[in-house]
A protein has these predicted regions:
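Active-site loop/helix belt of alpha/beta enzymes
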Residues: 2-16, 176-319
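Conserved, mostly hydrophobic/aromatic
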Residues: 58, 83, 105, 137, ...
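Short acidic, glycine/serine/threonine-rich loops at helix termini
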Residues: 91, 114, 134-138, 155-158, ...
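Structured core elements
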Residues: 100, 123, 145, 169-171, ...
């Protein structure tokens, strides 16, 4: 008979079919499969932890978003936000669905070109565009969204040297009733900065003003803020037409739509309270249609939606390392998933689901990662069934920003797989190895040898 591990007795309330703070029962069903592929098989073949992305979910989200806007507005174009998730397989899925590329660095610009996106369908945002970046953008006829006057002056000289007309827009920041304002980017609407930049562009021979851009925040919960922003950009566009007899081609509303994830501190779950893509679509399109644009002169509407389209398409699989009690008696579960690969655990209360059958007794639990840092907390308090060492878990809705902001701190970054429309599993990024990391390092000759 196998010897059982001893755990000191502790009187602790267990919950079984008891109401939670919302007056409903905390009920769990094991998440044993993703897109009909068994979690245990995925971990057995690809290791733990493991990111799993659903191609079907990406395509469904993209088509739902397009339908929401195109049913309300005649000219709509999405541009995939590379910074949200720039795995090539993810980007190319969005491009197959018709999305352009939206990038914020020279590195991301090169990635979009490498993904076979035409330069004319790359939107170049961000405050840090080097002169080489600008030259490349001008050469590829990209849409350059100017962030500040220094960039404007540099771009004018570069376009003049190249004897080309740079296609430009300006980023406009504004008061939409959401605070703090994102006024560090772009030109302010209220104090006249936007018009100052527009007047300069209209005087330059080597620039053509093709659009107006804004990005009012991140994880936005107020569709009305987008209605205000759309109205102010429409007023700017109409003012340009009146002053210069020049019609812009598009209004770019940026991104920032909230996903269905649960923000820390929220009383109710995001799936019940966060606005839908239809809510955002209605706010933006109704404002533009009811503005003073002639019906046959409505500008193209561009959306740079990222998080809302990718968050719920990916799961992170992991394994229980151990359980223990803190000094105050609280139960803790330690996973092989750290904040170094689940960066969004700093601002989300991610849903954690066991991947196998379990007892229906639950207990409030602190979920930690494997890092030797006290900040490595995946969930500060979550009601979970009792799990044992070696059990598997699924952390849901991890598609946005984790695969771009992760780092190899203490542990290496894991493999990423994508399940295609037919249920086939593809490795889209290999797990890191020490040899791969050492390829980038150099040791000075005098440090190569030592004795201890």
């Amino acid at each position: 008979m196998e010897k059982q591990r001893y755990e000191r007795p502790l009187i602790k309330k267990l919950e079984s079919n008891m109401p939670n703070k919302f007056g409903t029962r905390t009920e769990y069903l094991p998440m044993t499969h993703i897109e009909n592929v068994a979690v245990k098989d995925l971990i057995k073949e690809h290791g733990s932890p493991l990111f799993v992305i659903s191609e079907r979910a990406i395509r469904n989200n993209m088509r739902k978003a397009k339908k929401a806007f195109e049913n309300r507005y005649p000219k709509v174009q999405f541009a995939w936000s590379y910074k949200t998730n720039y795995m090539d397989a993810v980007c190319r899925t969005f491009h197959q669905e018709g999305s352009w590329a939206e990038v914020v660095s020279g590195f991301e610009f090169d990635k979009a070109l490498n993904n076979q996106v035409e330069g004319s369908k790359i939107i170049f945002n961000g405050p840090d565009k080097s002169e080489d970046d600008l030259r490349k953008a001008v050469a590829h006829n990209a849409l350059i969204h100017i962030d500040h006057l220094d960039e404007l002056y540099s771009l004018q000289e570069i376009a003049k040297e190249a004897n080309k007309k740079a296609r430009v827009a300006i980023r406009v920041n504004m008061d939409t009733g959401i605070y703090p304002m994102w006024d560090r980017f772009g030109f302010n609407y209220e104090n006249g900065q936007a018009w100052d930049a527009l007047n300069k562009i209209m005087r330059y021979e080597n620039m053509v003003l093709v659009g107006l851009h804004t990005h009012i925040g991140t994880f936005m919960l107020s569709p009305n803020a987008y209605a205000i922003a759309a109205g102010k950009l429409a007023d700017l566009a109409i003012g340009i037409k009146d002053k210069y007899q020049h019609e812009i081609q598009y209004i770019d509303m940026g991104g920032g739509f909230a996903s269905k994830n649960n923000l820390k501190g929220s009383f109710l779950p995001g799936i019940d309270t966060n606005p839908t893509i239809d809510d955002f679509a209605e706010a933006i399109t109704s404002t533009l249609i009811n503005s003073n644009f002639p019906p046959d002169k409505l500008p193209l509407l561009i959306l740079e939606t990222g998080r809302a389209l990718i968050d719920d398409t990916a799961n992170l699989l992991g394994t229980v390392i151990s359980n223990k009690r803190l000094s105050d008696g609280r139960r803790t579960t330690i996973l092989d998933i750290g904040v170094n690969i689940l960066f969004t655990s700093f601002w989300y209360d991610h849903k954690i689901t066991p991947a196998q059958a379990f007892t229906h007794h639950t207990e409030d639990t602190v979920v930690y990662g494997p890092l030797c840092m006290n900040i490595d907390v995946i969930r500060e308090n979550v009601n979970l069934p009792l799990m044992n060492k070696g059990d598997h878990v699924v952390i849901q809705s991890v598609g946005a920003y984790n695969m771009t902001q992760w780092m190899q701190f203490i542990t290496l970054r894991p493999r990423i797989v994508m399940i295609d429309m037919e249920g086939n599993v593809h490795v889209i990024r290999e797990s890191e190895t020490l040899d791969r990391l050492l390829e980038l390092e150099r040791v000075p000759k005098h440090l190569e040898k030592f004795e201890l």
